[in-house]
Swiss-Prot record:
CDD domains associated with the record: PBP2_HisGs
Protein family (similarity comment): Belongs to the ATP phosphoribosyltransferase family. Short subfamily.
Keywords: Amino-acid biosynthesis, ATP-binding, Cytoplasm, Glycosyltransferase, Histidine biosynthesis, Nucleotide-binding, Transferase
Known catalytic reactions: 1-(5-phospho-beta-D-ribosyl)-ATP + diphosphate = 5-phospho-alpha-D-ribose 1-diphosphate + ATP
EC number: 2.4.2.17
Domain notes: Lacks the C-terminal regulatory region which is replaced by HisZ.
Identification of the protein by name: ATP phosphoribosyltransferase
Pathway per the UniProt entry: Amino-acid biosynthesis; L-histidine biosynthesis; L-histidine from 5-phospho-alpha-D-ribose 1-diphosphate: step 1/9
Pfam families, A to Z: HisG
Organism: Thermotoga maritima (strain ATCC 43589 / DSM 3109 / JCM 10099 / NBRC 100826 / MSB8)
Compartment list: Cytoplasm
Amino acid sequence: MLKLAIPKGRLEEKVMTYLKKTGVIFERESSILREGKDIVCFMVRPFDVPTYLVHGVADIGFCGTDVLLEKETSLIQPFFIPTNISRMVLAGPKGRGIPEGEKRIATKFPNVTQRYCESKGWHCRIIPLKGSVELAPIAGLSDLIVDITETGRTLKENNLEILDEIFVIRTHVVVNPVSYRTKREEVVSFLEKLQEVIEHDSNEQSRG
């Protein structure tokens, strides 16, 4: 029995489509659990995917580069799933640039932001937020923000501009290292089927 951690939200539909194309048939489905022959899918928040794998509850999961780097886990990452590419960026009020001295940075990703500031040699005060990070500079809570953007539209709507690109975000297939050892045959077979489906879809799209 393979146990998968599936991120709820924008990735859910794409991941589930790929799973069904590998031949998975779900006999029971709910908002939090989907069960089929020899497979169980836990529907979880994207940030919780690595936690389910690290604690041995799930064997395989799907999550973004942002989550992996924020959580700092040592999961196996065999390949990506094709999705729209987004970026983790440093942004601030248009025309102000990066302030001198201590920088107040609001973000949903404090660990990523801390490492970024250290790499720049900056003295920063990091302000963790759960949502509406773009509001922080407008309200005077922060000088800058570190956040995810795909098109940059939300930043522009809030009179913010990108000051630096920290990294590109992709969707990773991740595997629990213990499961890879103890369920190697099942895990490898599943990954091979999934990769075949992804490659087939990519080839179909490239042919137009």
